[in-house]
């Protein structure tokens, strides 16, 4: 029987409320700012209640306001970012799943050496890898293309490692039963591994989608054409060094719209995400 401790419960709830405020307040503040004019935003103190320009700001931003500032429409920025995030998430999962499948279930020379080569890349800083990768993309003529934005970010040593660890927990009897049933590698992967891995895949998809959605450095390097910019690059271009020349109302509108897709993915896949993390820990 769990002993009830009112003081402990009170402290726990208080810490939870403080944490929620710390996380939610900046988002609320951004939403309030998106309902005001630029002059109202930069004039301190800014009110904490929504202004009167909410519908007007969003309508203007979506109907050409952002395009006049950065040279590309807000819809295009969102579309580019969505394509990049989906391609990176799906690409990482597919490549990592197949890599881990080959390492665990196939017997070939130097297979563990290949695994450690993949694993060692976790220790390499991004700065070490980014310049050689950029040179390859330039030589292949993939600047200002979706392939250039996504292909170099699809390989994932972390996801490969997680899939490998999960595959190692699969009982040998299950593998042996598949062999007795004359199940080939593709059938074994399709009928056994994929159903068992669906929660892990869902958890990884959420994490990798957010990773792809928030990319800044790589899109900054490989996009010169504003039509290929992502939402994060668009936000950076909107912000000038002087407050007076920055369209803060459009910046706040864009920031709110940039938050919605990742939040929607987390909310819609929350049950699978939590279940996948718990099963990964096991």
Curated annotation (Swiss-Prot):
Membrane topology listed for this record: Multi-pass membrane protein
Record PROSITE patterns: ABC_TM1 (PS50928)
Subcellular localization(s) per the UniProt record: Cell inner membrane
SUPFAM superfamilies: MetI-like
Ranges of residues in domain ABC transmembrane type-1: 78-269
GO cellular component annotations of the record: plasma membrane
Family label: Belongs to the binding-protein-dependent transport system permease family.
UniProt source species: Rhizobium meliloti (strain 1021) (Ensifer meliloti)
Gene: ugpE
UniProt-listed InterPro entries: MetI-like (IPR000515), MetI-like_sf (IPR035906)
Organism classification: Bacteria, Pseudomonadati, Pseudomonadota, Alphaproteobacteria, Hyphomicrobiales
One Gene Ontology term from the biological process aspect of the record: transmembrane transport
Subunit (UniProt): The complex is composed of two ATP-binding proteins (UgpC), two transmembrane proteins (UgpA and UgpE) and a solute-binding protein (UgpB).
Protein name: sn-glycerol-3-phosphate transport system permease protein UgpE
NCBIfam families in the cross-refs: PRK10973.1 (NF008210)
Pfam families: BPD_transp_1 (PF00528)
Record's keyword terms, sorted: Cell inner membrane, Cell membrane, Membrane, Plasmid, Transmembrane, Transmembrane helix, Transport
Chief place of localization: membrane
Chain segments annotated as transmembrane: 14-34, 86-106, 112-132, 136-156, 201-221, 248-268
Primary role: Part of the ABC transporter complex UgpBAEC involved in sn-glycerol-3-phosphate (G3P) import. Probably responsible for the translocation of the substrate across the membrane.
